[in-house]
């Protein structure tokens, strides 16, 4: 069944779904995708204008033969390996068939000598393919042959072979210190001195890359398959693109029976060659129909040396699933008109998605594409199920693809943080804001972090300031913060507490430690502003004339008001029971439509610190 392209916007492909119980197509997108997903494209492309470059709509789909259908079973096994411990019931919900994204493009190419390919590439740059992630210079089987086979084919060249005697003389001079005709042999002392001059402390002076060149190559694991063709297809699938020569112009000898596949109609061997891939608009053209620059190239080659292997060939460029970017795959998979989830947060090896309700029927399909297109950096894809409501600010996450490990390592501001997203809170989007806050600290400061989490601010500040006092209510966060302080060798510069934020403020400022605190950070946007009431009366047991210093407080909060700065300022004044509070307000980021995250910085007012309106704290 063929759908009309005029109904679809560019680069958006509706995917009908094939049920595992029926082979009929379902034209309307079903809310829950099943088993294998296939594309339907229009066969009438002449009336549609496509942008330059490759597209899933422009290429031809290869015909699925028996071997390619058999490879789908390998895809299913590979899928099981990628999703780790997922149940088979989950796997049956959706399986993306990567073969459906293979596209074949018919193009033309010029076969040129390998030694001239880079110069010719610069000369013909405007007439070459110039597709993203596709090199204009391509290699195919048969462009290089071993020397023994070249002699068998009878190479015609004017270049003289290197004299074997000169090679022997060079070896003798290197090993024995002399060669025939050099006169007397060097003494052992002079020979060692001569060799020593070619060395330095790092190895060979004249051959600095000798150690790298001499290093043995890595052994690659080869898959064992029953048939050679299956092995060839499996190796191709690991590549983004493959170029094959389909047809050459002119009569030539066929060496396929002698040398095997890939060494077909090549004529007499004239040396190493490469392919210069021409623009797709020149596909199927003869030499006389090509641009003048290319015709001049052929004319110059013919006049200079008739033995040069300049010839126009017809090629087949195959682009596999790995070539297409994530956005294009998702646009093809999701129904027409649906917003493509293109952005996600990275926490170590974990990709954190925030999918809309319309994406939920396709969540595992989306997660697989995200995992495939971002490996090996991404090994786990999760989605937040519900908004954050608990006191520990931990998120309810659902693992959609990859392994189930939510313990990861995050590097920020040159520090390493071990986090477990299932038990602690972490937001990579606030990395820039944390860095901005740290720029306001100096070596004379003493920092008190009331809601420290796993320590992104506290540990980073410990490298700058005199002392850091960090606290968090979540015992798991405290455990990870202690571990991170040891990992980053900062355990001697930070003191960690596990208690409620209000009680921590009261206990800290009622002790001698609180007298030295110059900076207070309260990064808990949901409740931090309301926790400011804990500062009322913190200096009641001291005299007003002691010359006390009052800390600068940095408090974060959310606001959905039309004027978020005014709303947040009012909440701060209400919590402190003080009207005259000079606050520096700053918008941090837009969390959701109409919801801002803000940062307010102010010096603790003297009237608040000596207020007699003490609160009674309840366990």
Curated annotation (Swiss-Prot):
Q: What GO biological process terms does the UniProt entry carry, in alphabetical order?
A: tRNA methylation
Among Pfam families, the record links this protein to: TRM5-TYW2_MTfase (PF02475), TYW2_N_2 (PF25133)
- Enzyme Commission code(s) on record: 2.1.1.228
Transit peptide range is 1-10
The family database entries (InterPro entries) matched by this protein are listed as: MeTrfase_TRM5/TYW2, SAM-dependent_MTases_sf, TRM5-TYW2-like_MTfase, TRM5/TYW2-like_N, tRNA_Gua_MeTrfase_euk
Family (UniProt)? Belongs to the class I-like SAM-binding methyltransferase superfamily. TRM5/TYW2 family.
What does the record give as the function of this protein?
Answer: Specifically methylates the N1 position of guanosine-37 in various cytoplasmic and mitochondrial tRNAs. Methylation is not dependent on the nature of the nucleoside 5' of the target nucleoside. This is the first step in the biosynthesis of wybutosine (yW), a modified base adjacent to the anticodon of tRNAs and required for accurate decoding.
The name under which this protein is listed is: tRNA (guanine(37)-N(1))-methyltransferase 2
* Organism annotation: Arabidopsis thaliana
């Amino acid at each position: 069944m063929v759908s009309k392209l005029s109904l679809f916007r560019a680069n958006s492909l509706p995917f009908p779904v094939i049920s595992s119980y029926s082979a009929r197509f379902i034209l309307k997108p079903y809310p829950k995708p099943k088993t294998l997903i296939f594309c339907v494209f229009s066969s009438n492309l002449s009336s549609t204008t496509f942008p330059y470059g490759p597209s899933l709509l422009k290429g031809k789909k290869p015909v699925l033969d028996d071997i390619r259908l058999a490879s789908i079973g390998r895809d299913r096994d590979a899928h099981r390996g990628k999703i780790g411990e997922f149940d088979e019931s989950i796997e049956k919900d959706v399986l993306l068939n990567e073969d459906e994204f293979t596209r074949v493009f018919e193009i033309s190419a010029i076969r040129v000598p390998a030694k001239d390919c880079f110069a010719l590439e610069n000369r013909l740059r405007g007439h070459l393919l110039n597709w993203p992630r596709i090199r204009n210079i391509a290699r195919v089987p048969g462009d290089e042959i071993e020397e023994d086979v070249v002699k068998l084919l009878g190479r015609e060249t004017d270049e003289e072979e290197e004299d074997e005697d000169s090679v022997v003389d060079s070896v003798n001079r290197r090993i024995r210190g002399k060669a025939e005709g050099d006169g007397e042999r060097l003494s052992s002392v002079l020979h060692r001195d001569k060799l020593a001059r070619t060395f330095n402390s790092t190895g060979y002076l004249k051959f600095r890359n000798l150690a790298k060149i001499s290093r043995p190559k890595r052994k690659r694991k080869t898959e064992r398959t029953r048939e050679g063709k299956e092995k060839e297809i499996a190796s191709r699938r690991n590549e983004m693109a493959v170029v094959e020569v389909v047809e050459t112009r002119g009569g030539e000898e066929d060496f396929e029976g002698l040398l095997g596949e890939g060494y077909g109609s090549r004529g007499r061997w004239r040396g190493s060659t490469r392919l210069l891939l021409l623009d797709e608009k020149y596909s199927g053209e003869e030499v006389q129909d090509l641009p003048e620059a290319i015709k001049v190239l052929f004319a110059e080659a013919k006049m200079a040396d008739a033995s040069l292997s300049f010839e126009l060939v017809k090629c087949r460029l195959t682009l596999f699933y790995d070539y297409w970017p994530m956005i294009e795959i998702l646009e093809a998979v999701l129904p027409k008109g649906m917003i493509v989830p293109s952005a996600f947060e990275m926490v170590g090896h974990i990709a954190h998605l925030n999918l809309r309700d319309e994406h939920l029927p396709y969540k595992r399909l989306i997660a697989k594409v995200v995992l495939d297109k971002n490996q090996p950096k991404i090994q786990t894809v999760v989605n937040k199920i519900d908004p954050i409501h608990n006191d520990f600010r931990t998120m309810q996450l659902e693992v959609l693809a990859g392994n189930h490990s939510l313990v990861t390592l995050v590097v920020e501001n040159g520090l390493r943080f071990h986090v477990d997203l299932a038990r602690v809170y972490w937001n990579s989007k606030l990395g820039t804001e944390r860095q901005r806050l740290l720029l306001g600290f100096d070596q004379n400061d003493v920092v008190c972090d009331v809601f420290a989490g796993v320590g992104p601010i506290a540990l980073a500040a410990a490298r700058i300031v005199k002392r850091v006092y960090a606290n968090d209510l979540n015992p798991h966060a405290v455990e990870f913060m202690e571990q991170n302080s040891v990992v980053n060798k900062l355990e001697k510069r930070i003191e960690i507490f596990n208690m409620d934020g209000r009680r921590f403020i009261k206990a800290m400022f009622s002790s001698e430690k609180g007298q030295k605190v110059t900076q207070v950070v309260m990064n808990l946007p949901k409740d931090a502003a309301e926790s400011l009431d804990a500062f009322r009366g913190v200096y009641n047991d001291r005299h007003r004339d002691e010359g006390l210093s009052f800390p600068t407080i940095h408090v974060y909060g959310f606001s959905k008001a039309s004027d978020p700065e005014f709303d947040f300022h009012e909440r701060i004044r209400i919590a402190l029971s003080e009207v005259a509070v000079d606050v520096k307000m700053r918008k941090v980021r837009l969390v959701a439509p109409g919801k801002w995250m803000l940062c307010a910085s102010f010096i603790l007012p003297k009237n608040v610190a000596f207020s007699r309106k003490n609160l009674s704290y309840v366990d």
